[in-house]
Design a protein with these regions (language model features):
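Patatin-like phospholipase
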Residues: 1-43, 51-302
């Protein structure tokens, strides 16, 4: 007699920079509902959070996030003009020393990350080798982080080709795919900031001022008689938002997940890494909203 096999649940964590801290809340809420994925894959920030989960370090990682301030964020920015504004070595060495320092094959559950080959535009699935190096390649957002040389190829952020890696989760053996899309409501977010009622704190303003000053130093100063345009930083982040939304919609239309969890994160910017608590709470709320679909597809574990 053939005994039916339990369906394998895969978790596909999308990219979205600082909004990716919402993935922590999503995972916590899934487990509280008795839904435990059998495998996890991620793009960009999703690759980072997914690795922490696959390594069994999510609780430690979450505690660090909740203590993360703007000063800490700025300390990780090793500014460089060789391939990107940020070299990325400080950040990766921090994670190597404090969280994840083992091969992908030795993680507690199957894990993979998505990157993009810079010279060909090919989608690259990183399913073996160093976990930290896979993360570094997947988060290499063009112009912000320098590319990574991996096995003779320059790799950049996987969000350029597959922002929510449903296809990778299927290839890893998932029968049911839960996709977490961080970009459902973010188009135009940065360009709306000037009309927002909430005034940024002095600390936040100083953080954004420093980064904008560094970027602005690379470009000619706008003349007083020219029309006021968005800052370089706003244009870049808004362009990234548009790209991720359009690619995500296209990919998921052709490769639909079984359940989509879509946290509402328009109030968080790409670089708001110090606002982890808000992102995590929104991730939890998004799971609550999707519970009927989740329960229909995924039989909760006792």
């Amino acid at each position: 007699m053939n005994i039916p096999r339990e369906p394998r649940v895969g978790l596909a964590l999308g990219g979205g920079a600082a909004r990716g801290w919402a993935h922590v809340g999503v995972i916590r809420a899934l487990e509280q509902a008795g839904i435990r994925p059998h495998l996890v894959c991620g793009t960009s920030i999703g690759a980072l959070v997914g690795a922490a989960y696959a390594a069994g370090e999510l609780e430690h990682f979450e505690q660090w996030l909740l203590e993360l301030g703007i000063t800490n964020v700025f300390s990780f920015l090793d500014v460089s003009m060789n391939g990107g504004l940020i070299k990325g070595d400080r950040l990766i060495e921090f994670f190597r020393s404090n969280f994840i320092d083992r091969p992908i094959k030795d993680l507690a559950m199957p894990y993979a990350a998505v990157a993009t080959a810079l010279h060909t535009g090919a989608e690259v699935w990183l399913r073996e080798g160093s976990t930290v190096e896979a993360i570094r390649a997947s988060i290499a957002l063009p112009a912000l982080f320098a590319p990574v040389l991996h096995e003779g190829r320059l790799l950049v952020d996987g969000g350029l080709v597959n922002p929510v890696p449903v296809s990778l989760a299927r290839a890893m053996g998932a029968d049911i795919v839960i996709a977490v899309d961080l970009s459902s409501d973010i188009i135009g977010r940065n360009l709306r900031e000037e009309y927002a009622l909430e005034v940024p704190s002095a600390e936040v303003s100083e953080w954004k001022r420093k980064l904008q000053a560094h970027i602005s130093a690379l470009f000619p100063t706008q003349q007083d008689d020219e029309p006021k345009l968005p800052s370089v930083l706003d244009v870049v982040t808004s362009s990234i938002n548009i790209m991720q939304v359009r690619i995500s919609r296209s990919r998921m239309a052709g490769e639909p997940p079984d359940v989509i969890i879509a946290p509402r994160l328009a109030h968080l910017g790409l670089l708001d890494f110090h606002r982890a608590k808000e992102a995590i709470e929104e991730g939890e709320r998004a799971v609550e909203a999707a519970l009927p679909s989740l329960i229909a597809y995924c039989k909760p574990s006792p």
